[in-house]
Structures are given as C-alpha cells and as structure tokens.
A protein has these predicted regions:
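Short hydrophobic/Thr-rich beta-strand motif most characteristic of the beta2 strand and flanking loop
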Residues: 35-42, 50, 112
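Charged docking surfaces used in two-component/phosphorelay signaling
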Residues: 25-33
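Acidic catalytic/metal-coordinating carboxylates
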Residues: 42-46, 71-75
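CheY-like receiver
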Residues: 133-145
Length: 145
C-alpha cells in the first residue's frame, strides 16, 4: 500500500484590474475555471491598496491598459516597485491605440487583445506565469520614463 501523497502546488493568485465590471466578472470566471485564485480591482487605486498588503500573495497582475484613473503600464510600474517578482499581463480592447502600441507592444510586453476566449486567456496566463522574471518587463517600463 502506497502511503505517499503527492504534494499539489498551491494555486496561483491573479490580481485582475479593469474599470469595467462585466470584464472583471467574465475574466474571474475564466480564471477560476483554470483553478486560479482571483482578486478583483475596479481601479488602479484599489489595485495599489491590494498590492500594498504584504499579507496577500499575488503571482500575476492582469491589467487593462486603458483605464480612467491610471494607465495599466503606469500601474504595473508602481506595483512592481512593491513586488519586483510579480509577472504582468496586459489586456485591452484597443490594440490599435497609441497607448497600447507605444507602452506595451513596442516593448514586447505580454499582451492579450480583447475579446479573448477562455482557452486563449488560460494559455496566455500559463505562458506568462512560466516565463522568466519580470526584470525585462521592468526594464521595458523604465525605458518609457
């Protein structure tokens, strides 16, 4: 009789930031179907409060690029200052906008255009989580400053 138990890795935790409640709701359902823990923030300010709590584990920041209170790349830069090990994935329905092109695509940062399928989201999240550290991402953001 085999009494060894295989240790299962803890589910990864994703902080999703978007100013549209419908997007937050749908993305949460998609990610939970992939066994991720999900925290939601409907503004950059809310995301910064969550990220500033050292008792909260966050493995991935999944943020909209264009939001009313702060652009996603600026939010990511501020959160990476608090959590340099964090992985980041940008999403946007405005893939042709100057902000997306200049601040995300031109720097080869991880990006998924809206709308996306559940499989597309889960595959992209897995790829970003398994990628090397976000130091290259931070360097790309610093080039914007």
């Amino acid at each position: 009789m085999d009494t060894t138990t295989e240790l299962q890795p803890h589910p990864k935790t994703i902080l999703v930031v978007d100013d549209e409640l419908s997007v937050l709701t749908v993305v949460k359902c998609m990610l939970e179907s992939g066994d991720y823990n999900v925290m939601l923030a409907n503004s950059a300010a809310a995301a910064l409060r969550i990220a500033g709590n050292n008792e909260v584990t966050i493995d991935l920041l999944l943020t909209d690029v264009i939001m009313p209170d702060m652009q996603g790349p600026d939010l990511a830069e501020r959160i990476l200052a608090l959590r340099p090990e964090l992985k980041v994935l940008f999403i946007s329905g405005y893939a042709d906008s100057d902000v997306v092109r200049i601040k995300v695509l031109n720097h080869n940062l991880s990006f998924l255009p809206k709308p996306f399928t559940p499989d597309g989201l889960l595959e992209t999240v897995e790829r970003v989580l398994n990628a090397p550290s976000s130091r290259a991402f931070a360097a790309g953001l610093n080039a914007l400053s």
